[in-house]
Design a protein with these regions (language model features):
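A short, N-terminal amphipathic alpha-helix
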Residues: 34-49, 88-92, 233-240
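N-terminal glycine-rich phosphate-binding loop and ensuing alpha1 helix
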Residues: 4-55, 59
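Divalent metal-dependent catalytic cores for phosphoryl transfer on phosphate-bearing substrates
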Residues: 238, 243-335
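Conserved beta-loop-beta/alpha segment of the NTase-like Rossmann-fold superfamily
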Residues: 79-151
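Conserved donor nucleotide-binding strand/loop of the catalytic core
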Residues: 67-80
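Conserved alpha/beta core of the MobA/IspD/sugar-nucleotide pyrophosphorylase nucleotidyltransferase superfamily
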Residues: 2-5, 156-208
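Charged phosphate-binding loop/patch that engages nucleotide di/tri-phosphates or the phosphate backbone
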Residues: 185, 197, 341-375
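Active-site flanking loop/helix segments enriched in acidic
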Residues: 207-227, 241, 256-262
Length: 375
């Protein structure tokens, strides 16, 4: 748990959206509007004191904000630029506010877990500014302490908020996050398309997020390389299965293949890895990772994402492709002295052989030969 008391959020939605025909805040995204996604991010993190600064096209935004029961303030100086909206937003904050999150309304992919991480850091370190960082790049929303409010409210700096925050760099703190959304905004139609793609894959880490997770958790190079090989086999198996009419999520199996041994070395590493990914909001991939050692197998069902990753993992040992027999014979030899371990290995082998048989029948190929061709 973390102390959300006296923390607020300011969303900036007063600008012109000059490079877009439509108001960016009102663009549709997953059945809601872009601005609703940002509001929901804070609400899901437990931040309820939210103010939206409106200006250009306020007449379109205000009815929606009323419907959402979100506070708003009108910036009559919106033509002067973003800093005027920031000043207006800070003016609207309750006097007892300790800090506020600042988010442009056209950044709808920020994860609620990122907001929680920033809040926890603020409670711990008491910095003037807490920045989320992804792959060494600072993004939004920064969490800005009340210590900065007087200088912001003067509103007379030519350098805007950036200049104010730069003067306080000595008391800034960075929080590394697995959230590429902190860097993604909507400036162009191409950006909007990327945002839409990211939204529909929001429970699947991007390639960059996978690499950030590896780095943060100090995953060994051997495990990273194993994961990349499993991911490549899983991806190509999924593509081939989809060609004959299945509907395997290629992006999900690729990410899960990479990350399946994230917690390798810990007891019940599959379940632990799944819990870690679930905590960061990657629910779909978390389920696949959690099942990669032991999964429920419906022999009458067609292979799904979990089955594809389970099988791909069993076809890789060390840095090479092996058969199911080779993979499990080595394990049987290693744990021959433990009857309990041997029973578990036999169960896993039987499961892998059944999946392999189903896939080979569907594709009409030898899976080991295909795997060697695919890598």
């Amino acid at each position: 748990m973390w102390n959300k008391d006296k923390m607020g959020a300011v969303l900036l939605a007063a600008g012109y959206s000059s490079r877009m025909v439509k108001c960016k805040s009102l663009l549709p995204l997953g059945g809601l509007r872009v601005i609703e996604r940002g509001i929901n991010t804070f609400r899901q993190a437990g931040i309820m004191d939210i103010t939206v600064v409106v200006g250009h096209r306020a007449d379109k935004l205000i009815p929606i904000l009323d419907e959402l029961k979100v506070s708003y303030v009108f910036n009559e100086k919106y033509s002067e630029g973003m800093f005027s909206s920031i000043v207006k937003g800070v003016q609207s904050l309750p006097a007892e506010t300790k800090a506020f999150f600042l988010l442009p309304s056209d950044m709808p992919l920020v994860k609620s877990h990122t907001v929680r991480l920033l809040g926890r850091a603020f409670n711990k370190v008491k910095a003037d500014i807490i920045y989320p960082v992804f792959q060494k790049h600072r993004g939004h929303p920064p969490l800005i302490s009340a210590n900065c409010f007087p200088e912001i409210l003067l509103g007379n700096t030519s350098g805007g908020l950036r200049q104010i925050l730069e003067r306080r760099e000595g008391n800034a703190y960075e929080v590394e996050v697995f959230d590429e959304g902190i860097l993604l905004d909507i400036d162009t139609h191409e950006d909007y398309q990327k945002i839409m793609t990211g939204y529909y894959r929001r429970d699947i880490p991007t390639q960059a997020e996978c690499e950030a997770i590896f780095k943060k958790m100090n995953v060994s190079e051997a495990i990273v390389n194993h994961g990349r090989m499993v991911a490549e086999i899983a991806r190509n198996l999924a593509l081939r299965l989809n060609e004959i009419g299945l509907n395997i999520d290629v992006h999900a199996v690729t990410a899960a293949g990479k990350l399946h041994d994230l917690a390798k070395g810990k007891p019940n590493h599959a379940q632990i890895g799944g819990r870690i990914l679930k905590k960061y909001g990657y629910y779909k991939v978390a389920q696949i990772v959690a099942a990669h050692t032991d999964m429920e197998l419906n022999e009458k069902a067609l292979p799904d994402e979990a089955a594809v990753v389970y099988l791909a993992d069993k076809l890789v040992k060390g840095g090479g492709i092996v058969s199911i027999d080779e993979r499990f014979s080595a394990s049987m030899d290693e744990y021959a002295a433990s009857a309990e371990a041997v029973a578990v290995i036999r169960e896993r082998r039987l499961r892998a052989e059944k999946i392999e048989q189903t896939v080979e029948q569907l594709l009409g190929i030898s899976l080991v030969m295909a795997a060697r061709d695919l890598c």
